[in-house]
Amino acid sequence: LGELADAAAALDWLQRQNPNTNQCWVSGFSFGALMCMQLLMRRPEITRFISISPQPNLYDFNFLAPCPASGIMLHGKKDELVPVEETQRLAQKLQSQKNITVEYEEISGANHFYDNEVHKLNKILCSYIEKELNSRFR
């Protein structure tokens, strides 16, 4: 996939710009969530992921067995493109794996694009990132 090669090239560039970092997070929205998770499987230096509105109804996520890093998945309860149950199932599958923690949040009132609900998405993401960063530096 050209998109995956682009994501890998972007990650390479970021790592060259930040050679002394001890963390590497990836994030993606919708189709980008698929790219983020595929990159996660190919790059062992990735320590966390954020997957926003993945599309397990359109794409096969079975390659995430086992998933090598902890992270969070978010989904709008009023998503008109991806049934909430599909993402719930994917999250449950990942949550059952050992040695990782996968959080799952549904955002009330949010559609696939979080129209008029971006503030809720931002609040959850900021809280998760702060919690994870603080736990790594205790």
Q: Where are the regions that the model predicts?
A:
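Acidic catalytic loop of the alpha/beta-hydrolase fold
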Residues: 78-82, 112
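Alpha/beta-hydrolase fold nucleophile elbow
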Residues: 18-29
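Alpha/beta-hydrolase active-site loop
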Residues: 1-17
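Active-site nucleophile loop of the alpha/beta-hydrolase fold
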Residues: 51-59
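Gly/Ala-rich beta-loop-alpha elbow adjacent to hydrolase catalytic centers
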Residues: 28-36
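C-terminal catalytic histidine-bearing segment of alpha/beta-hydrolase fold enzymes
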Residues: 91, 96-138
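Short alpha-helix in the alpha/beta-hydrolase fold that links the catalytic acid
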Residues: 69, 83-93
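Short beta-strand/loop motif that positions the catalytic acidic residue
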Residues: 67, 72-75, 79
